[in-house]
Amino acid sequence: MYFYNLVKNTDPEIAEAIKSELKRQQNKIELIASENFVSIAVMAAMGSPLTNKYAEGYPGKRYYGGCEYIDVVESIAIERAKKLFGAEHANVQPHSGAQANMAVYFAVLNPGDTILGMNLSHGGHLTHGSPVNFSGKLYNIISYGVDPETETINYDEVLKLAKEHRPKLILAGASAYPRVIDFKKFREIADEVGAYLMVDMAHIAGLVAAGLHPSPVEYADFVTTTTHKTLRGPRGGLILCKEKYAKLIDKSIFPGIQGGPLEHVIAAKAVALKEAMTEEFKNYQVQILKNAKALSTRLIERGFRLVSGGTDNHLMLVDLRNKGITGKDAEKILDEHNITCNKNAVPFDTQSPMITSGIRLGTPAVTTRGFKEGDMLEVADIIHDALTNSDTKENILIRVKALCEKHPLYKEFDE
């Protein structure tokens, strides 16, 4: 564990915390839909000497000297992002998905302008207009949700709201929506009311890159994403847009909302983007979907109710009300059995956001470990047994350990 040895002589407390976190990741089954495990190459790029360099500005136009190699790194990242997603322009500097979203808002909106976005409790994101977030404080937010019967987006309702409120920007994308989103339909709605169309594809970027989910790039004026999650890169953000908006977006990031970019993270983004161009990565994304189908199908067989009846992507929402257990309690119980997930509101939830009636499950991280469909059937059975007391805790922990040992994680660090 090279980083442990490098850190422990200076700071043994932090070194021990790092070591413990590695062991947690190795010995638990990670089902949080927004998490993944980066490659050693991505991790190494983040720990490189690039972290030492200030580089305010953009390649070829910096406010500091000595940026010639930084320019090489960032230019490669930009070109790879454009090529991977077929975009006219890319900004790789956002520190996070939230920063990417903020930059788009600040580029084309004024305080008080109207945004039409997905309700957080129906699968949206904090930055899509939640009243506790800057987006909900600065802008007039109109929210659309899912149909009570189908639990999928009702595009007729979105159009109706758009005609009624005439938003300046319509936002598509979600953090907990298990179905394919029709970006073409959103483009038609935006055109009908003269609105910008922005798509936040943070959760599905890897699937889009592999051609397994319709791409929003040809339809949206702006596309934002994180670079982790299904894209399996470092924690960070990315903005794609039409060339005509390039200067607006770049100015909005710097000097608008950020100062110096994190060039060590941008290097890691570049490495991850190169990995995403491989056949191996596409096969990985195919397996994510296969694993999600296997997990969701088995959970339904074991009596769990899935929001919308299943999944088209990497995640699923499990409504636990028929099991008489809250999302908060389920998260805690599963964690005690070495399975990590997160509590999550389900559409029309009556529980508070800190309690919830459901959990969100995803397959990107376990698929990176090498889990296949058969493993996911066992995972579903373990979830059932843990939440219904159908097996002893001791036996379940043995079953989880067997899966983790079958598919070791970062075994290079154990040498």
Swiss-Prot record:
<keyword id="KW-0554">One-carbon metabolism</keyword>
<feature type="binding site">
    <location>
        <position position="120"/>
    </location>
    <ligand>
        <name>(6S)-5,6,7,8-tetrahydrofolate</name>
    </ligand>
</feature>
<protein>
    <recommendedName>
        <fullName>Serine hydroxymethyltransferase</fullName>
        <ecNumber>2.1.2.1</ecNumber>
    </recommendedName>
</protein>
<dbReference type="GO" id="GO:0005829">
    <property type="term" value="C:cytosol"/>
</dbReference>
<feature type="site" description="Plays an important role in substrate specificity">
    <location>
        <position position="228"/>
    </location>
</feature>
<dbReference type="GO" id="GO:0004372">
    <property type="term" value="F:glycine hydroxymethyltransferase activity"/>
</dbReference>
<dbReference type="GO" id="GO:0035999">
    <property type="term" value="P:tetrahydrofolate interconversion"/>
</dbReference>
<dbReference type="InterPro" id="IPR001085">
    <property type="entry name" value="Ser_HO-MeTrfase"/>
</dbReference>
<comment type="similarity">
    <text>Belongs to the SHMT family.</text>
</comment>
<dbReference type="GO" id="GO:0019264">
    <property type="term" value="P:glycine biosynthetic process from serine"/>
</dbReference>
<keyword id="KW-0808">Transferase</keyword>
<dbReference type="InterPro" id="IPR015421">
    <property type="entry name" value="PyrdxlP-dep_Trfase_major"/>
</dbReference>
<keyword id="KW-0963">Cytoplasm</keyword>
<dbReference type="GO" id="GO:0030170">
    <property type="term" value="F:pyridoxal phosphate binding"/>
</dbReference>
<dbReference type="Pfam" id="PF00464">
    <property type="entry name" value="SHMT"/>
</dbReference>
<comment type="pathway">
    <text>One-carbon metabolism; tetrahydrofolate interconversion.</text>
</comment>
<dbReference type="InterPro" id="IPR019798">
    <property type="entry name" value="Ser_HO-MeTrfase_PLP_BS"/>
</dbReference>
<comment type="subunit">
    <text>Homodimer.</text>
</comment>
<dbReference type="InterPro" id="IPR015424">
    <property type="entry name" value="PyrdxlP-dep_Trfase"/>
</dbReference>
<dbReference type="InterPro" id="IPR015422">
    <property type="entry name" value="PyrdxlP-dep_Trfase_small"/>
</dbReference>
<dbReference type="InterPro" id="IPR039429">
    <property type="entry name" value="SHMT-like_dom"/>
</dbReference>
<keyword id="KW-0028">Amino-acid biosynthesis</keyword>
<keyword id="KW-0663">Pyridoxal phosphate</keyword>
<feature type="modified residue" description="N6-(pyridoxal phosphate)lysine">
    <location>
        <position position="229"/>
    </location>
</feature>
<dbReference type="InterPro" id="IPR049943">
    <property type="entry name" value="Ser_HO-MeTrfase-like"/>
</dbReference>
<feature type="binding site">
    <location>
        <begin position="124"/>
        <end position="126"/>
    </location>
    <ligand>
        <name>(6S)-5,6,7,8-tetrahydrofolate</name>
    </ligand>
</feature>
<comment type="function">
    <text>Catalyzes the reversible interconversion of serine and glycine with tetrahydrofolate (THF) serving as the one-carbon carrier. This reaction serves as the major source of one-carbon groups required for the biosynthesis of purines, thymidylate, methionine, and other important biomolecules. Also exhibits THF-independent aldolase activity toward beta-hydroxyamino acids, producing glycine and aldehydes, via a retro-aldol mechanism.</text>
</comment>
<comment type="pathway">
    <text>Amino-acid biosynthesis; glycine biosynthesis; glycine from L-serine: step 1/1.</text>
</comment>
